[in-house]
Amino acid sequence: MTATLERRESASIWGRFCDWVTSTENRLYIGWFGVLMIPTLLTATSVFIIAFIAAPPVDIDGIREPVSGSLLYGNNIISGAIIPTSAAIGLHFYPIWEAASVDEWLYNGGPYELIVLHFLLGVACYMGREWELSYRLGMRPWIAVAYSAPVAAATAVFLIYPIGQGSFSDGMPLGISGTFNFMIVFQAEHNILMHPFHMLGVAGVFGGSLFSAMHGSLVTSSLIRETTENESANAGYKFGQEEETYNIVAAHGYFGRLIFQYASFNNSRSLHFFLAAWPVVGIWFTALGISTMAFNLNGFNFNQSVVDSQGRVINTWADIINRANLGMEVMHERNAHNFPLDLAAVEAPAVNG
């Protein structure tokens, strides 16, 4: 008896939609995470472009002193930004329908909240989509794990830090100069340069760049030549070939002699795990540092740690940084405060009378 097996056609529109969403044959994989990622990222991108070009000034400090951020209001690509939502709004959810008018929503910086919340949803779904595609193809899940580092960093500066500080106005502005302003004020208020988690992040980013350049140059310099001297060595490579494209033994030997034997990897898996893990772990730590400093667990304070036998302070570099921090702190939000928060935290002297 012969049984003929035919591919079962999905009877419903929903079934065909499910097949299309989860198909790995599409030019760009959609996936269930993509169903949420696409509209959220499109919304964030569209509103960002419109607001960067045409948004009116925003009362970021809640003191009726609007700050201009868009191109049509006098900025250029370097100085322009999406200004964070007003301190008058704080952490309140502020969609358009919560404002009395669109003009009020724009004046209070509503676009910033809209962009940031859609963006964070979108990049989280992008990470989930990476895992989903890996799962469909039978791959291991580490691509999504690596991408979790920049997702954690973005979540820290756009969501965790504003929550800790009590207002979206403390979030990072969406622009070049605004990012620098955020970094300077963050240093002034939290001494991030003296935080060990930030130091680990610097080692991760710079070390990752160094290791990436070293690896790429070693591989490119030790290609297995399949061509004549008159042709490029690149022409001998076929995409998907089973044979190795470079000689890891030669690269290992070169690097081992350049520095010392055990500074070089002779195992390709160990090498590539290290290349991935170093920057990812560093950025994880930085995101964790931002998230703790959000709640004012700040960098180390070594101010006035060294004194002479008479009790006079001998300045160290920590004191120089502290002086710079005070200068930056008194200059930012200059009309919102009459004195820096460091002085405001000191208890006022008792007055008798």
From Swiss-Prot:
Site (Cleavage): 344-345
Gene source species: Marchantia polymorpha (Common liverwort)
Site, as annotated: Tyrosine radical intermediate: 161
Entry-annotated residues carrying Phosphothreonine: 2
Coiled-coil annotated spans: none
Gene giving rise to this polypeptide: psbA
Protein function: Photosystem II (PSII) is a light-driven water:plastoquinone oxidoreductase that uses light energy to abstract electrons from H(2)O, generating O(2) and a proton gradient subsequently used for ATP formation. It consists of a core antenna complex that captures photons, and an electron transfer chain that converts photonic excitation into a charge separation. The D1/D2 (PsbA/PsbD) reaction center heterodimer binds P680, the primary electron donor of PSII as well as several subsequent electron acceptors.
Pfam families: Photo_RC
Entry's cofactor comment: The D1/D2 heterodimer binds P680, chlorophylls that are the primary electron donor of PSII, and subsequent electron acceptors. It shares a non-heme iron and each subunit binds pheophytin, quinone, additional chlorophylls, carotenoids and lipids. D1 provides most of the ligands for the Mn4-Ca-O5 cluster of the oxygen-evolving complex (OEC). There is also a Cl(-1) ion associated with D1 and D2, which is required for oxygen evolution. The PSII complex binds additional chlorophylls, carotenoids and specific lipids.
Residues that hold [CaMn4O5] cluster according to the record: 170, 189, 332-333, 342, 344
UniProt PTM comment: Tyr-161 forms a radical intermediate that is referred to as redox-active TyrZ, YZ or Y-Z.
Enzyme class: oxidoreductase
This protein's UniProt keywords: Acetylation, Calcium, Chlorophyll, Chloroplast, Chromophore, Electron transport, Herbicide resistance, Iron, Magnesium, Manganese, Membrane, Metal-binding, Oxidoreductase, Phosphoprotein, Photosynthesis, Photosystem II, Plastid, Thylakoid, Transmembrane, Transmembrane helix, Transport
Annotated catalysed reactions: 2 a plastoquinone + 4 hnu + 2 H2O = 2 a plastoquinol + O2
Recorded GO MF terms: chlorophyll binding; electron transporter, transferring electrons within the cyclic electron transport pathway of photosynthesis activity; iron ion binding; oxidoreductase activity, acting on diphenols and related substances as donors, oxygen as acceptor; oxygen evolving activity
Prodomain residues: 345-353
Protein name as annotated: Photosystem II protein D1
